[in-house]
Every structure is written in C-alpha cells, then in structure tokens.
Amino acid sequence: MASSPILRTSDSPSLIPTTLEPESLPTYPWESSGKGKISPITKEYFRCRGSDLNPPIPILKDGKVVENIFDCHGADSHSLPIRHEKEFIYPILIELVNEIHSATGKPVIITSGHRCPSHNRYVDAEAKNQASKHQVGAEVTFYVAGLEHNPEVVLNSIFAFYGSTPRYASEGIEYTQFERYDKETDVSTKPWMNKEILIKLYMPHEGRNADNRHPFPYLSIQVRFDRETNMRVAYSPTDAQHFLRR
C-alpha cells in the first residue's frame, strides 16, 4: 500500500524537551510459565511500541511551535516489515535474544524492536536517527531482568554464542572474534562488532527515549550483514515504508 512520506524541515528546528515518565513493561509468556520453563521469543515481541496515547512533541523554531510530532497508533495499526510477502525481523536477532534467554536463564526484556517511521521519529527526531535500522527489522534494544546492572554477563553470552556455533566457526574470525568500533557514536562505551552484528551498550544516562524509559543500562544489537543474501544490511526508505496498514 502507498503512504505519504514523512517530511522534515531542512533547517533542523529544535525540540521542546519533554519529561519521560516510567511505564510498566508488558508481561512476557515466560514470566508465568513456571521456574525452569523457557518459552521461545518470537517476532511478536518485536512489534512497534508506538501509541496514540502518547502526547505530541512540539518542535520550536524561533521560539514558536512550527510542528507537532505525533506517535503512530501502535502495533494494532500496522504490521512488522514485509519481506517475501511475510512479516519479517532479521532471524539472527530472534536467535540471539533466545540464546541470551537460554544462557542466562533470565527474561530478556525487549524495549524496542521494529519501529515504523512515525514511531521512530517520535522516539528520536534528530536527523541522524532517521536512518535507524529499527525501521527495517534489523535492530533491537533490550536488557535482561535480574542482570540489569551486569550487562557484561549478557555480552559474554553473545561472544560465546559466536565462538561456539559451528556455522560461524567454519567461516573464521570475521564472525568468531569481535573488535571495537572506533568511530564517533551516541554511546560512551566503544561498541563491539563482528561481520554480522554491532553491539552498543547504553549506560543509565544515555539513550533515554519513549521506548527506553527504564533506569537501567541496556544493549542494542544491529544487523550489519545478511548471511542469507550475502549483502550488507542498511536502512532503506522504501523498505522502511514496506509494511501493512490496518
């Protein structure tokens, strides 16, 4: 289906700061499944977290409100990204959060999976965020309940996964070894990356937005390379708009 593009002004007007209020997180199936039982995390938990109950964010220019940014109507109003006529999240993201859940035995709390372009802009209207991979199902942010202040445990489970999984071991150090990303980013800790993914650690004073209102450090995983298509993964405006409207 066709939709109107999201427009931005070229002179980058400023945003009026808003106060983000803490909100309760959704209940996941494993939270009531009983001790020792692990329910798989599916793409359902990656759905857009927009809501028409969120207040508009006014944009100022020369002291005047020139625009209000509205959130989307939420996951009930649109699908996940569509690929090959099916709802799509990059499989490695689903595999990794399940691996973390299994390795730690603790709930993985996904705070932001897919973001439609409207919700992505509502979360962060800065120009640099408009190419976020959240919009194409290639990024997820999360923390692990019970390990909120021990993200290194979660990181180590990811590193161990790549080091012990045969399909990566057979392809060499491009996948099994992580290096640090030295370019400027929005985090104070240098990200980790291999050929397939890039991992960021957001400290409690970083990355707070409408999807991450909690006080904990959290991790972001971006997909860099699609092993299925053998192609680099990048944001595409066309792909970002390729979802079903309800």
Question: What kind of feature is each model-predicted range?
Answer:
Residues 98-125:
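Extended, low-complexity, intrinsically disordered C-terminal regulatory tails
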Residues 93, 124-127:
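Short acidic (Asp/Glu) patches
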Residues 129-139, 143-246:
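Catalytic cores and adjacent binding grooves of peptidoglycan-active enzymes
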Residues 1-45, 225-246:
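N-terminal secretory targeting signals
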Residues 44-105:
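Active-site acidic/histidine clusters and adjacent loop/turn architecture
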Residues 89, 110-113, 143-145:
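Short His-Asn-centered micro-motif
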Residues 84-88, 114-121, 190-199:
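Short linear motifs at secondary-structure transitions and domain/linker junctions
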Residues 11-22, 88, 98-101, 108:
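An N-terminal domain-start capping segment
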